[in-house]
Amino acid sequence: MTVNIAKMIDHTLLKPEATEEQIIQLCDEAKQHGFASVCVNPAWVKTAARELSDTDVRVCTVIGFPLGATTPETKAFETNNAIENGAREVDMVINIGALKSGNDELVERDIRAVVEAASGKALVKVIIETALLTDEEKVRACQLAVKAGADYVKTSTGFSGGGATVEDVALMRRTVGDKAGVKASGGVRDRKTAEAMIEAGATRIGTSSGVAIVSGQTGGADY
């Protein structure tokens, strides 16, 4: 595979105990390897933006994370605040319970609130949390994300057990077609797995093992 995997990696550190020193190291690694972005919790966006101010590496953060169980208004506020602090990509979690309740109108409105808050200022990736969904629910979630104007659909938070699978990535790609990107996250710890996800249709990889992936090693625990 000749694709530049580094340019597809969101170099991720979302552990609650992450320190400022570790966030700075994450940014240094992203600069060194030319990753697409660093993905950090909202409290670290300013730090990451400062560290990456003179680079092409984008700052990504998470919204309604990891449960997705906040209101559309709260997610919109989080998005605005993150953008003010320097985020250029936001990964939001859908209202999973609403999806499972069949309340597609709320799911779409929830996504749209973030899309509108980010409009013209940040990419929006929609985490559907595949480990908690049936295939039918995965398809519906992806359709709603596209309908609401999201830029990407994303498999997982990394906090709900299972992560990305080739099967889920392929299903998501078939569902969105060329209308959105697909981000595989959770459990991608080596180059072989990353390449399998890309072959299945992923256009972005979320991982805390970015350095291991580009250097042919195997990374440790997720996020």
From Swiss-Prot:
It holds the Pfam family DeoC. CDD domains: DeoC. It is found in: Cytoplasm. The active site is at 91 (proton donor/acceptor), 154 (schiff-base intermediate with acetaldehyde), 183 (proton donor/acceptor). One of its GO terms (cellular component) is cytoplasm. Pathway: Carbohydrate degradation; 2-deoxy-D-ribose 1-phosphate degradation; D-glyceraldehyde 3-phosphate and acetaldehyde from 2-deoxy-alpha-D-ribose 1-phosphate: step 2/2. It catalyses: 2-deoxy-D-ribose 5-phosphate = D-glyceraldehyde 3-phosphate + acetaldehyde. GO terms for molecular function: deoxyribose-phosphate aldolase activity. Keywords: Cytoplasm, Lyase, Schiff base. One of its GO terms (biological process) is carbohydrate catabolic process. Its EC number is 4.1.2.4. Belongs to the DeoC/FbaB aldolase family. DeoC type 1 subfamily. This is Deoxyribose-phosphate aldolase. It comes from Geobacillus thermodenitrificans (strain NG80-2). The lineage of its organism: Bacteria, Bacillati, Bacillota, Bacilli, Bacillales.
